[in-house]
């Protein structure tokens, strides 16, 4: 279609993996598709094939009615003709050029007046005023990233391709730039494909997430749906669902399903009315812990167990609880101290029925 990018291609490596990219992206409006997955899942390969930097083995890529690649027809449009903006993971700034020089390098071939005007626009847009004469080594990580973005945007590309755009930044800078980048992408109105393995980044930037694993696209959808309702156990593991256990539906009451998980009874919302064997997915932040065995919550699922591990993770702690199966909870480090959580501590884990996602198996 003329108002979207479609891609269905495979890249095979001799004696190596095969990467299969199947993507669809609306064009002509701001839309960010995030390719999310672990290292080696094929994210950057897909990005490079979209850019024309690598040639797929088979398949087709089309953008707004223009064929960029067609293996059968022998079509391979050059990267320049695709009019894309590609932000490399390391930014690839020229160390010998100033900020202004890096930006205007992308504007070669246009008149001097138009070049200067566009450079001023980008310096203002990316908050780089006053830094024009500095070289990359004199800039902070966040400033370098903004210069790289300015250079990528200089030619008003039809499509933006961002390869791990925030990975080179320290944590505090990454948090600040993340919000700036989201606003910039929406403000520019350029369709974007962004690669990341950071789920916080994916949630912050994406209109849509494509989860990759083993060289193929496993699930595509809105970020809240993909991260809270993974399509299968493989996706659940990739997006970081901490507890994935096998169970069986043994009873149904209205839209609720009773499940047996190794002798433990749990209730889950099951609006689709599926039955039989399934996986239960429970995110750690949906588990509440109380000391003792007398729960105060009205939630349906109260599981008596004992703490087997308390693992600090920055401002929070991951707590493993043996309750017939291993359930992971996420609590603040202060809460872990207040509750005196340690291996052997008896606790009750509480999980709402609506927080348990079921996947048929």
Task: Describe the function of each predicted region.
Residues 228, 263-318, 330-361:
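Glycine/charge-rich catalytic "coupling/switch" loops of P-loop NTPases
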Residues 51:
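Helix-to-loop junction immediately C-terminal to a conserved catalytic motif
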Residues 83, 96-234:
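ABC ATPase nucleotide-binding domains
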Residues 33-34, 76-78, 82-92, 193:
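ABC nucleotide-binding domain signature
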Residues 2-6, 10-29, 72-76, 111, ...:
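A short, flexible loop at the N-terminus of ABC-type nucleotide-binding domains that lies
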Residues 36-38:
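The feature captures the beta-strand-to-loop junction immediately N-terminal to the Walker
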Residues 59-71:
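Conserved ABC transporter NBD signature motif
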Residues 44-47, 147:
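ABC ATPase nucleotide-binding domain helices that frame the ATP-binding cleft
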């Amino acid at each position: 279609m003329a108002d979207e990018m479609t891609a269905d291609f495979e890249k095979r490596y001799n004696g190596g993996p095969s990467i299969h990219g199947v993507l669809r992206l609306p064009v002509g409006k701001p839309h960010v598709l995030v390719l999310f997955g672990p290292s080696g899942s094929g994210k950057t390969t897909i990005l490079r094939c979209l850019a024309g930097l690598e040639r797929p083995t088979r398949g087709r890529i089309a953008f707004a009615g223009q064929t960029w690649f067609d293996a059968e027809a022998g079509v391979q449009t050059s990267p320049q003709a695709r009019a894309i903006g590609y932000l490399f993971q390391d930014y690839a700034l020229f160390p010998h050029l100033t900020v202004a020089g890096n930006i205007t390098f992308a504007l070669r071939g246009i008149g001097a007046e138009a070049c200067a005007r566009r450079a001023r626009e980008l310096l203002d847009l990316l908050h780089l005023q006053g830094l024009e004469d500095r070289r990359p080594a004199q800039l902070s990580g966040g400033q370098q990233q903004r210069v790289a973005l300015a250079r990528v945007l200089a030619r008003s590309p039809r499509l933006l391709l961002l390869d791990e755009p925030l990975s080179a930044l320290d944590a505090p800078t990454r948090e600040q730039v993340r919000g700036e980048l989201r606003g910039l992408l929406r403000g520019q109105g350029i369709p974007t494909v962004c690669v990341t393995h950071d789920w916080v980044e994916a949630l912050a930037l994406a209109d849509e997430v494509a989860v990759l694993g083993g060289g193929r696209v496993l699930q595509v959808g809105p970020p809240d749906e993909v991260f809270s309702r993974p399509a299968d156990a493989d996706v659940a593991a990739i997006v970081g669902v901490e507890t994935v256990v096998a169970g069986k539906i043994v009873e149904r009451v209205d839209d609720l399903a009773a499940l047996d998980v190794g002798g433990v009874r749990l209730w889950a919302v099951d609006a689709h009315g599926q039955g039989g064997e399934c996986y239960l997915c429970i995110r750690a932040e949906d588990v509440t812990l109380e000391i003792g065995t007398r729960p105060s919550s009205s939630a349906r699922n109260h599981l008596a167990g004992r703490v087997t591990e308390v693992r600090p993770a920055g401002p929070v702690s991951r707590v493993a609880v043996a309750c017939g199966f291993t359930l992971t909870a996420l609590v603040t480090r202060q809460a872990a101290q207040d509750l005196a959580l340690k291996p052997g501590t008896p606790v009750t884990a509480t999980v709402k029925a609506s927080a348990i996602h079921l996947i048929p198996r």
